[in-house]
């Protein structure tokens, strides 16, 4: 049972800490839409250093490394960091809400990460990432498309919180946090997604 006194992101993070292996077992590598998005991201940024927030099992980082990019893998869940380190990768714990992002970075990647933040936390994360990126740097991320927010126990059998977005409400937040939209693509899957790429203004 989810307590109203607990932060939704912290509850979600505990779910990942508890069931990281279950997540890995139930999640494959990047699908065709994600691969196409990662390819476009790589083509846009060239061979630069990429900060990845929410690396999870590291599958997206591995794909980009195959394209010749250097990816700094991070995750707020220690269980995922330990999993990546055990596989021979450098990785560190980083909470996008509070931790120093380092930099300046030429590019940042956050696939299926920011969708766990509420709207105020999301805007704050965009500001923090902008401060850690060089002018003209590129930020790529994905969100679930829709209205409102909801809890789900899908995939992990534990509660995770999701905030849904639509393009008309997303664009002003990007502009207010000094990001110029490169592209916002609608991707249909089991659920509709928004694949977003923006450039630091």
Stretches with model-predicted labels:
Residues 1-51, 56-103, 120-124, 128, ...:
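Class I (Rossmann-like) S-adenosyl-L-methionine-dependent methyltransferase catalytic domain
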Residues 109:
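A conserved beta-strand element that flanks and buttresses the S-adenosyl-L-methionine
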Residues 112-116:
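Short catalytic micro-motifs in class I SAM-dependent methyltransferases
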Residues 118-119, 133-134:
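Helix-to-beta-strand junctions that scaffold the AdoMet/dcAdoMet cofactor pocket
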């Amino acid at each position: 049972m989810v307590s109203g006194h607990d932060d939704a992101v912290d509850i979600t993070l505990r779910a990942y800490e508890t069931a990281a292996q279950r997540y890995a077992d139930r999640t494959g590598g990047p699908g065709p839409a994600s691969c196409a998005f990662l390819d476009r991201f790589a083509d846009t940024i060239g061979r630069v250093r990429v900060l990845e927030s929410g690396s999870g099992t590291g599958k997206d980082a591995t794909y980009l490394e195959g394209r010749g990019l250097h990816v700094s893998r991070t995750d707020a869940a220690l269980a995922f960091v330990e999993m990546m380190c055990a596989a021979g990768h450098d990785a560190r714990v980083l909470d996008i809400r509070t931790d120093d992002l380092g930099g300046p970075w030429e590019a940042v990647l956050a696939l299926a990460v920011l969708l766990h933040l509420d709207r105020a936390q999301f805007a704050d994360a965009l500001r923090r990432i902008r401060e850690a990126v060089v002018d003209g740097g590129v930020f790529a991320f994905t969100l679930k498309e829709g209205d409102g927010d909801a809890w789900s126990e899908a995939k992990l059998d534990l509660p995770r919180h999701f905030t849904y977005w639509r393009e008309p409400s997303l664009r002003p937040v990007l502009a207010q946090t000094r990001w110029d939209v490169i592209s916002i693509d609608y991707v249909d899957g089991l659920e509709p997604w928004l694949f977003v790429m923006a450039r630091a203004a």
